Amino acid sequence: MIRTGRTASAGTGARAPERPAGLPAGAPARAPQHAAELPAGAAARPIEGLLLGLAAGDAAGWPAARHRASRMPEWTRRLTRELDTFAEQNATTTLPVPIALNQPPEPLRLGPSDDAEWAAFVAESVLTAAGVLLSDLSRSRRMRAAIDLAWNALASEVAAAAERAPEVESAVLPLRARISVRAGLGNLATGLRPPATGHDNPHYFDDAACVRACVLAVVHPGDARAAADLAEFDARYTQDGDGVHGARAMAAAIATALASADVDAAVEAALVQLPETTEIGRNARHAVRLARTHQDGGAFAIVPTLEHEIVDHVYSYGIAAAETVPVALALATAARGRMTEAVPAAACLSRVADSAPALAGALTGALGGGDSIPAAWREACRTLSGCALPRLAGTDLVELAALLAATELTSPKG
């Protein structure tokens, strides 16, 4: 596990095109030279940008405070629910927020939550694949074996918890996860295997695997198809349909971004992975078209249009990949790859704010590299709190990025 307190090498990371003099940090470089052809000193630390951009987007969305509040005593969350009921019954417009009262408020401070922790979970699989445990396997088989080991280890915890509960769904687990992930783990615990674990799943369509796919892309920088295939292998544990298509799209976009730092190329790579006859395919093409035809005002200007034409207000959860992935691609396009524009705009779309800002941040962070992340956000978001995966508390994303960048699996030729 990666802990805070150690200094990561500033020069590690997959290489990106050289940035012209005077170009603002975070703006996409458009040098035609391929990343792998640049000298070592030109590295922009795109893996660091990817992880920190994802974490900053995760932190920027309003649900992050509720996720992080899980580290507070249960009675504080119960009181918040009671205050919400009071507001409803008494027609008051003063709405409650997560509270600390007489408890230390540290868990409620700005920082990453569940998306960043599940991204780190996948990053551990990359490091496992790069280690000696699976060194006798081929490159592709090592990654798939590491992913399978990680999921089955969690499923074993579910099985053990289920033995102490009347049914799998009510088992008390040492983790917090999306409905799709919990259902997938429950399926694994009962003996099912992918793709059944993702197909026989009430939330097969959500974007949980899309977040994981962002990290898996580092294994295939510049190879969108290979990155998408690996993301699909992982996604099948918890998703089906648009949930899988979205994972393929995000992996393809970020794999392209890691090698070219060209936002249009990255978005096109994502669209290639989205069948036109699917909801996510139709939404993504429409959203990107909106971004490209309304470029004057930047990302913030198209927020109302995306809200009215892409975001759905019918279902009880705003985590459908068919909404969040198109929003992320459109805002990255409208922001011209600038993380500091795409993430705040995504956070304005409150219904999809649980993951759309994280997806937009991952893509634009990979495009801009580690230096595109504002210093204050870097410090606030580099350390995981363990609100979803307690064993990851204290994990330093900057150090994790350096470790990922140093493995043979993340180099273009491996």
Give the ranges of each region predicted by the language model.
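Structured, active/binding-site neighborhoods that engage oxygen-rich ligands
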Residues: 1-15, 22, 26-414
